[in-house]
């Protein structure tokens, strides 16, 4: 049985605090291994990529054709999809693109009361690297969620790296790459791929920003290379918090909880409800549904290790504070009127409003990005957006009159800070 925490019990605060503080990131000590891989790629370039790709993926980068997946191959993968699946990917891409186009910031250019011209210009980075995992996490939706905002932002060069164990590439991922319009796809994965994107090699030219999910080695590589390049975030295991009253169908809520549990054994699913009987019904339905899932083994491991049910007396009064402390990646508000909860909860990666808005629809076709902060990082960070592929340059301009209005204050502050050259730069113009 998974833990059930009752908010009215004396030991609730201690138990909830342990839940908040628990870490689910992989405990493997990968830091040293990743440091070694990064150094090897930085110093040995393509030769290191050949070695690591053979060792980890069982794939030889022997000839030029072995290194890249052609854009023609991506186009063929798209054309060969079943029509209904092709239409679903197209719909997802259209909605993702429309949502992110609405995020584009506006440049500013104005003259203030002192006559100083001020403003800012937004520009896209030149090149972005998109990491696409192989194996269990080879999701075409993730490629769309990373590549489309970059293209909307105006990035000119989109580079995908993806491991292809034994040379096999996921055709759905290739089809998504065709839809998103990526420019290059390299058959390289792991920390070594992140290093290649950051440092560049003879074959793979460096990029400015790296985004995309990956395993512990990929996440650690991004962490270590932040500053050499920009990154989206250091992501951990997926998580969902469902706030639900007893008016819900317990089957629906059970399925929503399992939508994250099936991702990985370290994923976490939490239910907050104000009805203990409903909580028991949901638990029963979780057990039934796990037995029906092809991903049941993973979901069972996740639910048994990290699933939690919290029973409160008043959802409106108690759930927001608990949700803020959890700062979950996904928060579902399965109640009649989710608006008060939406505005009361300050820390969440993405919020899903009402009984007809399961998290799964946001993963694919709603439009908002599904690359979201995990591990309580929603307290200080946001989901992926066009801004992750852009930077802002401020500008200012003064004439003689406006310089006379504000220059003396600048000189006084420079003297106060003990920087006479700064002061002289201003004072010479004031004479």
Language-model regions: role of each:
Residues 110-175:
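Conserved small-residue-rich beta-alpha loop and adjacent elements
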Residues 324-431:
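C-terminal core of ALDH-fold dehydrogenases
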Residues 3-8, 184-189, 308-315:
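Short acidic-hydrophobic, aromatic-tinged amphipathic segments that line or gate anion-handling sites
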Residues 259, 263, 271-348:
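A glycine- and small/hydrophobic-rich beta-loop-beta segment
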Residues 45, 128, 150, 214, ...:
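Buried hydrophobic positions in well-ordered alpha/beta secondary-structure cores of metabolic enzymes
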Residues 1-125:
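N-terminal Rossmann-like NAD(P)+-binding subdomain of aldehyde/semialdehyde dehydrogenases
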Residues 181-268:
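Conserved NAD(P)+-binding/catalytic subdomain of aldehyde/semialdehyde dehydrogenases
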Residues 141, 152-168, 244-252, 256-294:
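Glycine-rich phosphate/diphosphate-binding loop of Rossmann-like nucleotide-binding domains
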């Amino acid at each position: 049985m998974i833990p059930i925490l009752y908010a009215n019990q004396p030991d609730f605060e201690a138990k909830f605090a342990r839940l908040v503080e628990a870490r689910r990131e992989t405990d493997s000590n990968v830091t040293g291994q990743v440091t070694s891989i990064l150094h090897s790629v930085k110093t040995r370039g393509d030769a290191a990529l050949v070695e690591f790709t053979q060792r980890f993926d069982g794939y030889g980068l022997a000839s030029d054709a072995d290194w890249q997946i052609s854009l023609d191959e991506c186009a063929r993968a798209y054309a060969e999809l079943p029509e209904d699946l092709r239409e679903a990917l197209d719909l997802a891409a259209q909605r993702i693109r429309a949502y992110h186009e609405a995020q584009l910031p506006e440049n500013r250019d104005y003259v203030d009361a002192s006559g100083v011209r001020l403003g800012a210009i937004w520009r896209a980075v030149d090149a972005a690297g998109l990491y696409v995992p192989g194996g269990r996490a080879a999701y075409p939706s993730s490629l769309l969620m990373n590549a489309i905002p970059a293209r909307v932002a105006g990035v000119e060069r989109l580079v995908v790296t993806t491991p292809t164990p034994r040379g096999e590439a996921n055709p759905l991922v290739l089809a998504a790459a065709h839809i998103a319009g990526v420019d290059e796809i390299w058959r390289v994965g792991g920390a070594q791929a992140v290093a290649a994107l950051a440092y560049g090699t003879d074959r793979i030219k460096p990029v400015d920003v790296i985004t995309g999910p990956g395993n512990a080695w990929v996440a650690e590589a991004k962490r270590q290379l932040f500053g050499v390049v920009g990154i989206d975030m250091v992501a951990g295991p997926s998580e969902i918090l469902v706030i639900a009253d007893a008016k819900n169908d317990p089957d629906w809520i059970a399925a929503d909880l399992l939508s994250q549990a099936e991702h990985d054994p370290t994923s976490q699913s939490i239910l907050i409800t104000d009805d203990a009987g409903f909580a028991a019904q949901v638990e029963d339905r979780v057990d039934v549904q796990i037995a029906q899932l092809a991903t049941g083994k993973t979901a069972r491991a996740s639910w048994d290790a990290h699933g939690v049910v919290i029973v409160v007396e008043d959802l409106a009064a108690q759930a927001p504070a608990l949700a803020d402390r959890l700062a979950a990646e996904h928060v579902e508000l399965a109640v009649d009127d989710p608006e008060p909860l939406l505005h009361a909860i300050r820390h969440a990666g993405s919020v899903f409003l009402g009984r007809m808005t399961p998290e799964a629809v946001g993963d694919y076709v709603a439009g908002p990005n599904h690359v979201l902060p995990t591990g309580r990082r929603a307290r200080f960070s946001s989901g992926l957006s066009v801004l992750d592929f852009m930077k802002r340059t401020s500008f200012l301009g003064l004439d003689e009159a406006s310089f006379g209005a504000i220059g003396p204050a600048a000189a006084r502050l420079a003297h106060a800070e003990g920087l006479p050259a700064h002061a002289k730069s201003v004072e010479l113009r004031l004479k």
